[in-house]
Regions:
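Catalytic domains of cell-wall/extracellular-matrix polysaccharide-remodeling enzymes
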Residues: 80, 126-235, 240-246
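Active-site beta->alpha N-cap acidic-glycine motif
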Residues: 43-131, 135-136, 142, 146, ...
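Terminal accessory/targeting
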Residues: 1-65, 83-92, 205-246
Length: 246
């Protein structure tokens, strides 16, 4: 009998210890049962809550979007645009014509220095047709030569005027076209407000916005768009970053 009583006491003691450990585990780590958090999950949630309450948002990648400008550089408006982008810490992509780059090389150098992408928009804004392939090709080459002389680098991105392109140039010239996903038709509107509304209504992550840096209304709209979308969590990057994603 004494032996049986001793075994019973041992079982009770072991059960008490197990219950105690279980309760300690609940206090320290939580449990999966009943939908509660495990220790690892609980710590992660607490960390997120601490970050949020401390003013630090959860680790979410910023939404990228790209501003692109055609036909420049313009001696007045491009400078104003570059000033505004620098103040806001925003990057852009400039698809310049060879003839304007030759006239204003200091603006091309500033674009390069401030981290913007510089692309080819042909020499004289020629549109590719079925009858002028070689002339178009020569304009691409001439503009590349102009830009390399100014910057020391070979452009690899081209914005073909009106979107007309021949994929054969990609092999021949090692150049790649950049089109757009948002066209607010700024070239035919003197109202910056209208341009802004068209862009904001279509703004999405990884969007490529087409504008022209030769109109005052376009510059005003562009800087407003940067302010507005930055406040929504967007970051303005060169178009190369968008194309790498896509």
């Amino acid at each position: 009998m004494e032996h049986l009583e001793h075994k019973k006491e041992k079982r009770n003691e072991r059960a008490a210890i197990q219950l105690g450990l279980f309760l300690v585990g609940l206090l320290l780590f939580g449990t999966v049962a009943g939908g509660q958090l495990t220790g690892k999950e609980k710590n992660g949630k607490e960390k997120a809550a601490i970050q949020t309450s401390g003013g630090v948002s959860d680790a979410v990648e910023p939404k990228k979007i790209a501003l692109t400008f055609d036909d420049g550089p313009h001696p007045v408006y491009t400078k104003i645009l570059l000033d505004g982008l620098a103040e806001r810490g925003a990057k852009a992509s400039f698809f310049v014509t060879g003839e304007n780059a030759e006239k204003y090389p200091e603006l091309i150098l500033r674009m390069q220095k401030e981290g913007h992408l510089i692309g080819n928009h042909t020499y004289s804004h020629i549109q590719l047709t079925s009858n002028n392939r070689e002339a178009f090709r020569q304009e691409l080459i001439s503009t590349n030569e102009v830009l390399k002389e100014i910057t020391g680098a070979d452009p690899i991105f081209v914005r073909p005027p009106y979107g007309s392109w021949d994929k054969g140039f990609e092999q021949e010239l090692n150049m790649f076209p950049v089109l757009w996903t948002i066209d607010p038709l700024d070239w035919c509107s003197q109202s910056s407000t209208n341009v802004e509304k068209r862009i904001l209504s279509k703004a999405r992550e990884n969007a490529i916005i087409l504008l022209h840096d030769e109109y005052a209304s376009s510059i005003e709209a562009a800087l407003f768009i940067v302010d507005e979308l930055q406040s929504q969590g967007y970051v303005f990057v060169t178009v190369e970053e968008i194309m790498l994603v896509s």
